[in-house]
């Protein structure tokens, strides 16, 4: 009720709600003119979460196709075989974005849809699909942002070479084909989405594919949490840097594009003003976003990791340092939430070593009994807008103010809400408005931000949560896959009107 009254107190936009009634879509004083000229607003998805058609048209299986078949791994044992079927409904989804005044669409390309075996023979049907998607985006005036990898390694590479644990160059074949085939139209490339999540959740606690970890940290049949996350992260950094190097050498001059990487960044705020809690928060930042952006900017891992992980942390050769350092044209920051961090005051060395264990911190979601912010449906996601400002200014100050996009931001509702409940998502409207106010503040204070992407365009398959979590600004009825723009979608439409003064 409070949110509804808050919206009512502001000026009405004249837009129609999904139910047909006039609703207030107050933007908090924000509009396109609030941001620098050329600033892009987009939405984002990933191939595995929205495409469906996992076993047809020549696509090979990914590690997630195998992982979802393990009973109990995914809520309600859901799969992504159909999900929201963007493979067949991409025109409908692009038309939706155009109607909502969206500038750009960030999507990922399924590696196993291009190379069913991870390398070797190319699947022409997969290439044709992405050609159709890219061409239709451009036809409708929407800029494509293509991500080369979003968690979905071809299963064949996992089975033959131990996947990302192997320092093998098969990613080279993928990015070569993608740059050659789509680079005449795609000018914004990302190599990896959230490589930290890939390494940590896939190899430290094993709750993501391929499900590897030490026995002490999860229910895994194989793995080593003390070493494997660091090996995988190292290989991802090298693969990223090699892709950027090759693009710059062979394609950038002609295609006039750019390449970046997408990093998740929870802001970690010290619980108290004590030095111990400040140190804990900084350790968390170093092990989180610093794990990747520090070597990419400075050519080495943060001192925190070097001092704590020691011989378990792989080393870059001199040639690799030259390749890795400076290997971004821009960086995407995925920012959703903020936590308080405190020092656990543990002086003894733990019996079992692992990536998360190495942080040596305590997570806190409240201070003096007061929650850090309202919680969304997901238990990890709290609405803390000021954390976005601090995260962006941290990158600006600590890493030389690189060109940035805010590549993911959003909140979820329960999967079982009704259509009526889902469409009137006033909490999401408030979330986006509050976070964009903080993003504008960061821009005004000097952060070199060039775009913002809402997660997500559509309700979709949400990894471990299956279909029990809805992040979309467009409601999807999973029975017939019909799309219904939510109030948050209409809010963006109002925000992004192009005739505003």
From Swiss-Prot:
Binding annotation for a beta-D-glucoside: 49, 150, 193-194, 336, 408, 455, 462-463, 471
Keyword Aminoacyl-tRNA synthetase attributed: no
Enzyme class: hydrolase
Residues with attached carbohydrate: 77, 219, 360, 416, 424, 448
Disulfide linkage: 213-220
One GO-annotated biological process of the protein: carbohydrate metabolic process
UniProt keyword Signal, yes or no: yes
Catalytic activity: Hydrolysis of terminal, non-reducing beta-D-glucosyl residues with release of beta-D-glucose
Catalytic machinery residues: 194, 408
GO MF annotations, alphabetized: beta-glucosidase activity
Record PANTHER family: BETA-GLUCOSIDASE 43 (PTHR10353:SF161), GLYCOSYL HYDROLASE (PTHR10353)
Signal peptide: 1-14
Record-given protein name: Beta-glucosidase 43
Keywords: Disulfide bond, Glycoprotein, Glycosidase, Hydrolase, Signal
Cited InterPro entries: Glyco_hydro_1, Glycoside_hydrolase_SF
Annotated family: Belongs to the glycosyl hydrolase 1 family.
UniProt EC number: 3.2.1.21
